[in-house]
Curated annotation (Swiss-Prot):
Zn(2+) binds at residues 67, 71. It is found in: Cytoplasm. Binds 1 zinc ion. Its main location: cytoplasm. Belongs to the SprT family. The active site is at 68. One of its GO terms (biological process) is response to stress. It comes from Listeria monocytogenes serovar 1/2a (strain ATCC BAA-679 / EGD-e). InterPro entries: SprT-like_domain, SprT_Zn_ribbon, Uncharacterised_SprT-like. This is Protein SprT-like. Residues 7-145 form the SprT-like domain.
């Protein structure tokens, strides 16, 4: 999905669920990490996280769109648009939008190092120069044996 398709989807979702037009811009923002989208109060634009579309699919992504459109329409109507406001919670229930997003699994590269002398192995996230460091147990030389990707739930 590109920016134009996102804009079209946002306008369609707004008309279908809120019976109101979406008159501002919807854009992808890949820098968003722990949030599915955000409504910008000053410009009234909505930024969406493309990783949620990739990881969870279009149906879940439309739920996030509905959540952001709740902020959008309530703010323009000068009603309570924040998560704690009663107007916001009622509109979320009415349009069946999620209150929170699921976390995206994060990809971490783990590097395995092994001691040549004692055979002890350990994992590190950051690589290091094996010529500058020694084994903490026996003082032997270290070698990098493996690098693997691990997916975690925490952001």
């Amino acid at each position: 999905m590109n920016q134009a398709e996102l804009q079209r989807h946002m306008e369609e979702v707004s008309l279908q669920f809120f019976q109101k037009e979406f008159r501002h811009q919807a854009v992808f923002n890949a820098r968003l990490r722990t949030t599915g989208g955000r409504y910008l109060l000053k410009s009234h634009n909505i930024e969406m996280n493309p990783k949620y579309l990739e990881n969870f699919g279009l149906a879940y992504f439309i739920g996030i769109m509905k959540h952001e459109l709740c902020h959008y329409h309530l703010h323009l109507e000068k009603k309570g648009y924040q998560h704690r406001d009663q107007d916001f919670r009622e509109l979320l229930k009415k349009v069946d939008a999620p209150r929170f997003c699921a976390t995206i699994p994060r990809e971490i590269t783990m590097h395995e190092y092994t001691c040549k002398s004692c055979g002890k192995s350990f994992l590190r996230q950051r690589r290091f120069n094996v010529n500058r460091y020694r084994c903490g147990s026996c003082g032997g030389k270290l070698i990098q044996t493996d690098s693997k990707k691990i997916y975690t739930e925490n952001p």
